[in-house]
Structure formats: structure tokens, C-alpha cells
Amino acid sequence: MSEPIRVLVTGAAGQIAYSLLYSIGNGSVFGKDQPIILVLLDITPMMGVLDGVLMELQDCALPLLKDVIATDKEEIAFKDLDVAILVGSMPRRDGMERKDLLKANVKIFKCQGAALDKYAKKSVKVIVVGNPANTNCLTASKSAPSIPKENFSCLTRLDHNRAKAQIALKLGVTSDDVKNVIIWGNHSSTQYPDVNHAKVKLQAKEVGVYEAVKDDSWLKGEFITTVQQRGAAVIKARKLSSAMSAAKAICDHVRDIWFGTPEGEFVSMGIISDGNSYGVPDDLLYSFPVTIKDKTWKIVEGLPINDFSREKMDLTAKELAEEKETAFEFLSSA
């Protein structure tokens, strides 16, 4: 057995965490021979609920869980971390402007970035889930100058998985048969789900998605809006936001960081845009296609971008630049 790793989940009393913690504890994310010390952080009013989650994790009797720590204190939560999964954020309330939401979250992620900087290992991998995820991730990274910015990523894997699933449903295959879809940009309704480079396995051979679907207007229209608005559709139907699918996407994202991506496949995650070859301005936290090896991501370079894609990629970059500007105004005054 290897040494235990310390894994933090914030917002640990919430519903995404409730769907996520069992998978982390049972070895589905870090492997079946990796012991874990699981740290659960939430705000003080949630400590009663968190106690219940702690009891349930104990009652799961998971052999890999060496210890579970529930706390509302950052100095305990962020100490010596190997992995931080930042799920907790201020949710958008009725009548709340996006700007107000940004302001509330800048405060949270500035504090958590500073706590990572002060207490966590410098090699910590930080995954931001709480929305607005891209800008929250950038805020945390800026507030943790001693941790390499490449160690920060935000979740767009849920969008990626949604795009895969839509193509699979359209063609009557399993999601597993679809690979190399891309989510460009922001985890918001301006994101651009791109299948120009995606492949699908049909009758044992790989075919381009455009060739397989044979319906360009669907791929350039309804497919894109369905993926962009899927989160809202789930809320409308379930009266709660996506939790099971979000937790599954977090597992996929973190497992790929830990073990790497399969040969010939790439995945989507929000990462720092510095030095990309796709004309996205530097210093944005933007979702790109990446391959991962030795816990290090690399942007997939050299994919041809048509005019349709260019316009959509620029639009979501513009939104991210505006979010960043608003967030940084708050950051300097926070």
C-alpha cells in the first residue's frame, strides 16, 4: 500500500459532494491501492449536516479511507493537501445579477486560494467546480502565487460528457463509442461544444461525427444549444441542479489528471490560456482540448479551426475577459 494522500472536498455537506464522496472513498478516482485521508470543509451552519455525511462515510466501511476529517476551519482543511476539489460556492439566488454572484465568489475563492498558498503542498492539484467555475479558478490561482498556475483547472468535463451523450443518443451508440469532442471557453451558456474533430465508432470503424450524423444543421444548431442549456433543463425538471452527473464528471476529470488520458484521446478542461495556439488571449481560464501524462496537461495543438468555430470561440473568450475584469475589480478591493 502506498502512503495516504490528503484530498479536500469543499461544500462537503452539499448535494454534489454527497454524490461524489463515495466514489473517492471506494478507489474509483485514485485507484484501488491508494489510501486516502478525506477532508470535508463546509461553512459553520452546515456542520450538523456534515456530521451526518461523516457518519455515513464511516458506515460505508471503506478500506481505503484511512481517516475522514470534517471541519469549518481553513487551516485544518487546507493543510498538506495533495488534491483540492473546490465544490462549494455561493449559489445564484433569485433576482441576483451575475455581477453580484461574481462578487460573492471572488471573496470565497480569494480566501481559499490564500489558504492553499499558506497550508497546502506546492504540488497540490486544484480542481474548481463551484460556479462561475472558470473565473473562480482564476481568482484562486491568482491568490496562490506560490503554487504553479498549471496546477489549477476547472470542470468543463460535465459539458464534455453531455456533448458525447447527445452524439451517442443521436446515432444510437454508447457514449464510449464517441471521442474527442471539445468544449471551448467558459462553463456557461456561451461555451462552444465542437465536434469537428470528434470521432465515433460505427460498425467497428472510426468515422468523423459530421460524416456519421449527416445533419449539419442539427450539429450547428440544436446540438450546441442543447449542451449549452442542459444544466438549466435539469434544474427545470428536477428543481435541483445536476449532482449525480456533476459528481461523475469530477471523477472523470480528477482520474484523468491522476492517471493520464488514453492514447489518441483528448478531454476538455478549463486551464490557464497562456501560450495557446488558438488565438485565445493569455491569462484567461479557458476550456481547451488537452492530453494528460504524468499528471501534467498539454493543450492539443494544430487542430484546424473554421470560421463558424472561430466566431464561437471568440464570443466565449470575450465573456471570460469581461468576467475576469469584474472579478479583478472586486479582488483588488476585497
UniProtKB/Swiss-Prot annotation:
<feature type="binding site">
    <location>
        <begin position="129"/>
        <end position="131"/>
    </location>
    <ligand>
        <name>NAD(+)</name>
    </ligand>
</feature>
<feature type="modified residue" description="N-acetylserine">
    <location>
        <position position="2"/>
    </location>
</feature>
<feature type="modified residue" description="Phosphoserine">
    <location>
        <position position="309"/>
    </location>
</feature>
<feature type="modified residue" description="N6-acetyllysine">
    <location>
        <position position="118"/>
    </location>
</feature>
<feature type="modified residue" description="Phosphoserine">
    <location>
        <position position="241"/>
    </location>
</feature>
<dbReference type="InterPro" id="IPR001236">
    <property type="entry name" value="Lactate/malate_DH_N"/>
</dbReference>
<feature type="modified residue" description="N6-acetyllysine; alternate">
    <location>
        <position position="298"/>
    </location>
</feature>
<dbReference type="GO" id="GO:0030060">
    <property type="term" value="F:L-malate dehydrogenase (NAD+) activity"/>
</dbReference>
<keyword id="KW-0816">Tricarboxylic acid cycle</keyword>
<keyword id="KW-0007">Acetylation</keyword>
<feature type="binding site">
    <location>
        <position position="92"/>
    </location>
    <ligand>
        <name>substrate</name>
    </ligand>
</feature>
<feature type="binding site">
    <location>
        <position position="105"/>
    </location>
    <ligand>
        <name>NAD(+)</name>
    </ligand>
</feature>
<feature type="binding site">
    <location>
        <position position="112"/>
    </location>
    <ligand>
        <name>NAD(+)</name>
    </ligand>
</feature>
<dbReference type="GO" id="GO:0047995">
    <property type="term" value="F:hydroxyphenylpyruvate reductase activity"/>
</dbReference>
<dbReference type="GO" id="GO:0005829">
    <property type="term" value="C:cytosol"/>
</dbReference>
<keyword id="KW-0520">NAD</keyword>
<feature type="binding site">
    <location>
        <position position="162"/>
    </location>
    <ligand>
        <name>substrate</name>
    </ligand>
</feature>
<feature type="modified residue" description="Phosphoserine">
    <location>
        <position position="332"/>
    </location>
</feature>
<feature type="binding site">
    <location>
        <position position="131"/>
    </location>
    <ligand>
        <name>substrate</name>
    </ligand>
</feature>
<feature type="modified residue" description="N6-succinyllysine">
    <location>
        <position position="318"/>
    </location>
</feature>
<keyword id="KW-0560">Oxidoreductase</keyword>
<dbReference type="GO" id="GO:0006734">
    <property type="term" value="P:NADH metabolic process"/>
</dbReference>
<dbReference type="GO" id="GO:0006108">
    <property type="term" value="P:malate metabolic process"/>
</dbReference>
<dbReference type="InterPro" id="IPR001252">
    <property type="entry name" value="Malate_DH_AS"/>
</dbReference>
<keyword id="KW-0597">Phosphoprotein</keyword>
<feature type="modified residue" description="Phosphoserine">
    <location>
        <position position="333"/>
    </location>
</feature>
<feature type="binding site">
    <location>
        <position position="42"/>
    </location>
    <ligand>
        <name>NAD(+)</name>
    </ligand>
</feature>
<feature type="modified residue" description="N6-succinyllysine">
    <location>
        <position position="214"/>
    </location>
</feature>
<feature type="binding site">
    <location>
        <position position="98"/>
    </location>
    <ligand>
        <name>substrate</name>
    </ligand>
</feature>
<feature type="modified residue" description="N6-succinyllysine">
    <location>
        <position position="110"/>
    </location>
</feature>
<feature type="modified residue" description="Phosphoserine">
    <location>
        <position position="217"/>
    </location>
</feature>
<dbReference type="InterPro" id="IPR011274">
    <property type="entry name" value="Malate_DH_NAD-dep_euk"/>
</dbReference>
<keyword id="KW-0488">Methylation</keyword>
<keyword id="KW-0963">Cytoplasm</keyword>
<keyword id="KW-0832">Ubl conjugation</keyword>
<dbReference type="InterPro" id="IPR015955">
    <property type="entry name" value="Lactate_DH/Glyco_Ohase_4_C"/>
</dbReference>
<dbReference type="GO" id="GO:0006099">
    <property type="term" value="P:tricarboxylic acid cycle"/>
</dbReference>
<comment type="subunit">
    <text>Homodimer.</text>
</comment>
<dbReference type="Pfam" id="PF02866">
    <property type="entry name" value="Ldh_1_C"/>
</dbReference>
<dbReference type="GO" id="GO:0006107">
    <property type="term" value="P:oxaloacetate metabolic process"/>
</dbReference>
<comment type="similarity">
    <text>Belongs to the LDH/MDH superfamily. MDH type 2 family.</text>
</comment>
<dbReference type="Pfam" id="PF00056">
    <property type="entry name" value="Ldh_1_N"/>
</dbReference>
